Amino acid sequence: MHIFITGIAGFIGANAAEQLLKAGHRVTGIDNLNDYYDPQLKQARLAPLNKNPNFRFHHAAIEDPDVLKNLFEANSFDAVIHLAAQAGVRYSIENPRSYLNSNLIGTFELLEAARAHPPKHMLLASTSSAYGANEAMPYQETQRADHQMSFYAATKKSTEAMAHSYAHLYQLPITMFRFFTVYGPWGRPDMALFKFTDAILNDRPIDVYNHGNMRRDFTYVDDLVQALILLIETPPSDTPVTTEDSLSPVAPHRVLNIGNNAPVALEEFIAAIETATGRSATRNLMDMQAGDVPATWADTSLLQALTGYQPKTDIQTGVRKFVDWYNSYYS
């Protein structure tokens, strides 16, 4: 298959491309390589991909309609994995305009390009933040998700609605996946695992929000990528697979959680980092950050029914692999 990935130089995009290339697929990717975090880290993720003859990289922004139009005209993509986005709940409070451009306009331009040259399946990234103030645990795809707590979450929930309209109007098979706190080697510097590891190894205190009373459904990146690969060949059909299927009644459109189905307390997460680094953390206990939620928990039963997906990586193993990568990369 020929697969198009947006946000190819990102943490998830580069990992997905690596696994797809290993499986013998062709991959074309696009990324604007912006400076939200260190562009050299993005270039380092791309370096091994660029050595593969089945890989093509385009340095451009998805908000540019001509770029996507030309790419879709010149290629026949079997599947699209849309990962390009301005990420980060906290950053969106101070820089909302960048989320408007990348998340909303960029997704619109991608949907327009796909409308003219339809792939067999589009997989578009949403987020667990789309569940907003919902306190019913675990999060299930058929639950109401109406009260987003940050502009980032609002833009991602909006892309779900945009995608549904295109699926209905143009019969584009679209799966929206809400992923839950993805972590692992090559992770983003703005994420807790990277920030905590960097601080602990450099004898700085870590900021612990809500005084540590937080739980997250941490999802190891290899598990997430395996779910995406399984989903590529599972586009929405006319028939629900469970009684709680989020399949739209009027469009080939489905929303799916991708998580670990096992929330981890923040203190357990920090303890895993302390064990992996061999050092103790100095905690700076703080109030809850605006736009954040105290807990997330993915119900993955629909994903399991569709693909047989089973996450394989526990938090201790995943954190250790990240710390090993961090020490190697920054040595």
Predicted segments — roles?
Residues 15, 40-44, 70, 91-94, ...:
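Generic recognition of short, well-ordered alpha-helical segments
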Residues 158, 162, 166, 196, ...:
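Hydrophobic alpha-helix immediately C-terminal to the catalytic Tyr-X-X-X-Lys motif of short-chain
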Residues 19, 200-331:
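C-terminal substrate-binding subdomain of Rossmann-fold SDR/epimerase-dehydratase oxidoreductases
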Residues 63, 87, 187, 264-265, ...:
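Short alpha-helical
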Residues 1-182, 228-232, 309, 313, ...:
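N-terminal Rossmann-like NAD(P)+-binding domain of SDR-like oxidoreductases, especially those catalyzing
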Residues 137-138, 189-197:
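A glycine/serine/threonine-rich, flexible loop-to-helix segment
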